[in-house]
Amino acid sequence: MPERYTSMMSNLFRARSLMLAALALAAAASTASAQQGAASAAPKRQTDANQSALPATAARVRSTLEKVIHREVLPNGMEVIVVENHGVPLATVEIDVKNGAFTQTPEYEGLAHMYEHMFFKSDSAYPQPDAFTQHAAELGAVFNGSTREEVVNYYLTLPADSLEAGMRLLESAFRAPLFRPDELAREKEVVLGEYDRQESSPFFKFQDEMNHRLWRSAYSRKNTIGNREVIRTVTPEKMREIQKHYYVPNNASLIVAGDVEPQKVFALAREIFRMPKGADPFGTQPIPEVPPLPADDAVIVEQPVSTVLVMEQWLGPSVGEDPEATYAADVFSDVMNQEGSTFQKRLVDSGLWHSVLVNYYTLDHTGPITISGETTPGKLREALAALDAEIAKFDDPDYFTAAEMALQKQQRAVGTALGLERASGFAHELGFWWSVAGLDYYMGYVDNMASQTPDQLRAYVRKYIVGKPRVTGVLISPQDRQRIQLTLDDLHHARLTSSAGGNR
């Protein structure tokens, strides 16, 4: 069995990658990839020729997507999505489920991820331990899964001539898991081991403190790694409860990408995935709204780190409620991260910050807006003051230009086209967007990005950032904090409420 990667595009490690990544977002396959980190690009200012080419590029990308992405909804509500890519004789078969941290009450905190670990265990068709793994090996398949905030995915990549067998293998795991107590006991220790490894990172405490303050009563619905005690006491009955509510065909999609024929895939899906439609899981258990931040908050976390990391976070738009703002958020983030932008010149080129990154993570149930950066203890106070000054100017008429925006739109369009080249990665990407925003959002993404104007970006920052409550966090070593006598009073824009691991 391939090495399992932990879930969720973890907020935990996102903190580190955001702070240490390069500053300009290069061509990104989607907002999903751009939101988890940045690829260095060093783009130049947009020329008139490039600006005029943008609409044609956007149109070509949408046209290409419509040619290679095929869809059908089965009678039981399962959406089947097929992506043709005949470059190599391989196919990826993936099931995506609208589950993840966002469905978790405190009593189930971390069990969406626990369920992911149990998916490839015994089921009614393969009841013996390791039978699933053995059959997958016979098919020449590699398989894995991941749990994020608003989607869980499971996939096999295998020779295209084993497509039907791979679909049957995933169907039985989806429909009829056994949750054997012996397997659950073993896999629980694996998940606890993942928890221990993450907890040992200096960034774990920092991100966890930020998450508690940003999400407040919704914390369990953003905490994919979960609660140790909930994981330790997991039972087969809790696994079955998750299956009953969320693992129903009308809450799942089947994505097949690679060297396949769409009509053959649809016929196989109709034959194999015939389980009855289930109840709407969100009709019986609706997801509560994330509570608004009542005021600014701040925290200082002491850990053995060699630099100073700063994070500012706001509650951003929900894609289902304010989709237009999500397009503006992505363009705005790209423009701010572009080398040569006003933001980068005043903060990084000035020497106050080693790096600063602006980020919006698209989610249906409130996506976070994050500005993260790295500086030195000696420059921290001045760096924070400079960052505050720039944030206050985000909606100034001359803070960014249409020319700066055009280059970033073009890079997004090119990145989407390039993403089609790798079938397995594209399947994962489609699964994320299907669950979080709907496939129609993804299909129209490049067009909507291309239509954004400076006024729309300014409206976004006024609605969600400038003058809005935020959470500010500083990660610093105990020695550096003592040396510079850092207190929450130094985070001057925040209403001082707490300090983790040190004195006020």
Question: What are these language model-derived features?
Answer:
Residues 35-60, 253-255, 372-374, 404-504:
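C-terminal regions of mature proteins
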Residues 41-47, 216-217, 224, 248-249, ...:
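An aromatic/glycine/proline-enriched structural segment found at the starts
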Residues 44-54, 166, 173, 198-248, ...:
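Scaffold signal of the M16-like zinc-metallopeptidase fold and its non-catalytic homologs
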Residues 57-96:
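Mature N-terminal segment immediately following signal peptide/propeptide cleavage
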Residues 92-157, 200, 221-224, 337-353, ...:
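M16/MPP (pitrilysin/insulinase) zinc-metallopeptidase core fold and M16-derived inactive scaffolds
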Residues 121-126, 157-188, 339, 360-419, ...:
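M16/insulysin-pitrilysin zinc metalloprotease superfamily fold
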Residues 137, 190-209, 288-308, 342, ...:
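Short acidic/His-enriched helical or mixed secondary-structure segments at domain edges of catalytic enzymes
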Residues 311-315, 336-375:
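A structural supersecondary motif
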